[in-house]
C-alpha cells in the first residue's frame, strides 16, 4: 500500500522520539477521490488508533491508515530527500484524487473519469457539478446537473458548447449528451 523509504523512516523515528511513548504516524487523505484531495502525515498517539485502521509495520515505526483513505493510498511513497538546499519530506499518492481508468475500461467508467477529473473541476468554480446517470443503448450520455448549474440560464450553452463537445471528441462511440435535470431557478443558480 505505502512505501516509506529508509531515510523517511529514520526522520520519523527521530521526530517520534520526542513524542508521548507509543506515538506513531498516521497517513491520510482529506477529500479522497476528488479533485481537491490532499494527503498528509500526522502524529498518531496510542489513544487515536481506531479498530478499523490499517496498521502498516515498518522497521522503525508503524503507520496507521484510516479505512476511508486506504484505497486512495495504493502505490503511495514517502521519502526524505536531502540536497544542497536542505531536507524535504515528500509524499506521492498517485491515486488520491481518482484512479486513472484504463483505455479499455467500460465506456461508463471512462466517461465518469472524464467528468470527475476534467469537467467537474471547471464547473466547481461556479459551485456546480454534473453526474452521469446512464449511457443509453443508442449512445446518449444522460447527465444531471447540480449545485450552481441547476437552474442556471447558461446550462444549455455549458452542455452543448462545453461538455458535449469535449465528450464527443474524447469518446467517438457517444452520439450525444442529454440533460435529465429538472432545473429550478433559485439563489443557488449561478446565472
Curated annotation (Swiss-Prot):
Cofactor: how and how many bound: Binds 1 [4Fe-4S] cluster per subunit. The cluster is presumably bound at the interface of two monomers.
UniProt keywords, alphabetically: 4Fe-4S, Iron, Iron-sulfur, Metal-binding
Query: Which cofactors must be present for this protein to function?
Result: [4Fe-4S] cluster
Could you tell me the Gene Ontology terms of the biological process aspect for this record? iron-sulfur cluster assembly; protein maturation
Entry's transmembrane regions = none
A molecular function annotated in GO for this UniProt entry is: 4 iron, 4 sulfur cluster binding
Write down the Pfam families for this protein, in alphabetical order. Answer: Fe-S_biosyn, NifU
Where does this protein hold [4Fe-4S] cluster?
149, 152
Q: How does it assemble?
A: Homodimer.
Q: What does this protein do?
A: Involved in iron-sulfur cluster biogenesis. Binds a 4Fe-4S cluster, can transfer this cluster to apoproteins, and thereby intervenes in the maturation of Fe/S proteins. Could also act as a scaffold/chaperone for damaged Fe/S proteins.
To which protein family does this belong? Answer: Belongs to the NfuA family.
Name of the protein in its database record: Fe/S biogenesis protein NfuA
Amino acid at each position: 500500500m505505502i512505501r516509506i523509504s529508509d531515510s523517511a523512516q529514520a526522520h520519523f523515528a527521530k521526530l517520534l522520539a520526542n513524542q508521548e511513548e507509543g506515538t506513531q504516524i498516521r497517513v491520510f487523505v482529506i477529500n479522497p477521490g476528488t479533485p481537491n484531495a490532499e494527503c498528509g502525515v500526522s502524529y498518531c498517539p496510542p489513544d487515536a488508533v481506531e479498530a478499523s485502521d490499517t496498521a502498516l509495520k515498518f522497521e522503525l515505526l508503524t503507520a496507521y491508515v484510516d479505512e476511508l483513505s486506504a484505497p486512495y493510498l495504493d502505490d503511495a511513497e514517502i521519502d526524505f530527500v536531502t540536497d544542497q538546499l536542505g531536507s524535504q519530506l515528500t509524499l506521492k499518492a498517485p491515486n488520491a484524487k481518482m484512479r486513472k481508468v484504463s483505455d479499455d475500461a467500460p465506456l461508463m467508467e471512462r466517461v465518469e473519469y472524464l467528468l470527475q477529473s476534467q469537467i467537474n473541476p471547471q464547473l466547481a468554480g461556479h459551485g456546480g457539478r454534473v453526474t452521469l446517470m446512464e449511457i443509453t443503448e443508442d449512445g446518449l450520455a444522460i447527465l444531471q446537473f447540480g449545485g450552481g448549474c441547476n437552474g442556471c440560464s447558461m446550462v444549455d450553452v455549458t452542455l452543448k458548447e462545453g461538455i458535449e463537445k469535449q465528450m464527443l471528441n474524447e469518446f467517438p462511440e457517444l452520439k450525444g449528451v442529454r440533460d435529465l435535470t429538472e432545473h429550478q431557478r433559485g439563489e443557488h443558480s449561478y446565472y
